[in-house]
Amino acid sequence: MVRVVIESELVRTEKELPNSLKLRQFKDRLYHVTGVEPEDMEIVVKRQYDNKEIYSTKKGGAYSNEDEDANFLKGEEELIVVVTDSNAQSISNQLATQAEGIPSMEVISEEDYLRRDQSVLRWKMAHGYGRFNAAQQSQRAALAKQDEAYAREQLTAAIGRHCRVTVDGSAPREAILRYVGPLPLDVMGTWCGVEFPEAAGKNDGRINGVTLFGPVAPGHGSFVRPRAVEILSKDEESAEVEDVHDDVESDDEI
């Protein structure tokens, strides 16, 4: 375990975190303390004893691979983690602007933070925002159920076939379906491993040191949700279609 002081606009608290966390898990822990959405986080990690910066992310950036270990947690007994919300319109930034009489450097417990009227997580829980939105969570559960059925009934038998991959409205990319199944990560449900003819992906077919297909050339593989995969007909497979890739970050592609 590593002792961490977590600072944001609305809270400064201490926690002990496992030093075996992945980057994705680390961001999720920070979300539950600060209320800042993972995609909006700017993170700076410093050693507590000399204030030296050992890790940081930039505004609008993303981890090169969120499934890698958070190596900065290893070998360090005490750290300071500063979380800044890069989204000026976010709830946490609005509450920080409105908050009065809250000493910014006061160390409080997570329980005291949650009890505060200005707590971002309190606001989200009260208003059903983000992960506390029951309707949204129900919709996600329904999508996951549809994914499972689609993968089981159509995609498993189509491994090796050409497909079209469309993630979050980005331009379609042609690929070959290489894998259907779970991932060795803390993500739920079935995923599809695809191989692109060009470096339009996220990895080489390996996740967390486990080879799920390939390995292929670096950047030629990705794992996407089943709903992002459309198996091409025989006629479409033989036709030449230009492969266009927009560099769009999405939780539905790893």
Swiss-Prot record:
<dbReference type="GO" id="GO:0005737">
    <property type="term" value="C:cytoplasm"/>
</dbReference>
<dbReference type="GO" id="GO:0006457">
    <property type="term" value="P:protein folding"/>
</dbReference>
<comment type="function">
    <text>Acts to sequester alpha-tubulin from interaction with beta-tubulin, raising the possibility that it plays a regulatory role in the formation of the tubulin heterodimer.</text>
</comment>
<comment type="similarity">
    <text>Belongs to the TBCB family.</text>
</comment>
<keyword id="KW-0143">Chaperone</keyword>
<dbReference type="Pfam" id="PF01302">
    <property type="entry name" value="CAP_GLY"/>
</dbReference>
<dbReference type="GO" id="GO:0008017">
    <property type="term" value="F:microtubule binding"/>
</dbReference>
<feature type="compositionally biased region" description="Acidic residues">
    <location>
        <begin position="237"/>
        <end position="254"/>
    </location>
</feature>
<keyword id="KW-0493">Microtubule</keyword>
<protein>
    <recommendedName>
        <fullName>Tubulin-specific chaperone B</fullName>
    </recommendedName>
</protein>
<dbReference type="GO" id="GO:0005874">
    <property type="term" value="C:microtubule"/>
</dbReference>
<dbReference type="GO" id="GO:0005634">
    <property type="term" value="C:nucleus"/>
</dbReference>
<dbReference type="InterPro" id="IPR000626">
    <property type="entry name" value="Ubiquitin-like_dom"/>
</dbReference>
<keyword id="KW-0206">Cytoskeleton</keyword>
<dbReference type="GO" id="GO:0043014">
    <property type="term" value="F:alpha-tubulin binding"/>
</dbReference>
<dbReference type="Pfam" id="PF14560">
    <property type="entry name" value="Ubiquitin_2"/>
</dbReference>
<comment type="subunit">
    <text>Binds to monomeric alpha-tubulin.</text>
</comment>
<feature type="region of interest" description="Disordered">
    <location>
        <begin position="234"/>
        <end position="254"/>
    </location>
</feature>
<dbReference type="GO" id="GO:0007023">
    <property type="term" value="P:post-chaperonin tubulin folding pathway"/>
</dbReference>
<feature type="domain" description="CAP-Gly">
    <location>
        <begin position="182"/>
        <end position="225"/>
    </location>
</feature>
<dbReference type="InterPro" id="IPR029071">
    <property type="entry name" value="Ubiquitin-like_domsf"/>
</dbReference>
<keyword id="KW-0963">Cytoplasm</keyword>
<dbReference type="InterPro" id="IPR036859">
    <property type="entry name" value="CAP-Gly_dom_sf"/>
</dbReference>
<dbReference type="InterPro" id="IPR000938">
    <property type="entry name" value="CAP-Gly_domain"/>
</dbReference>
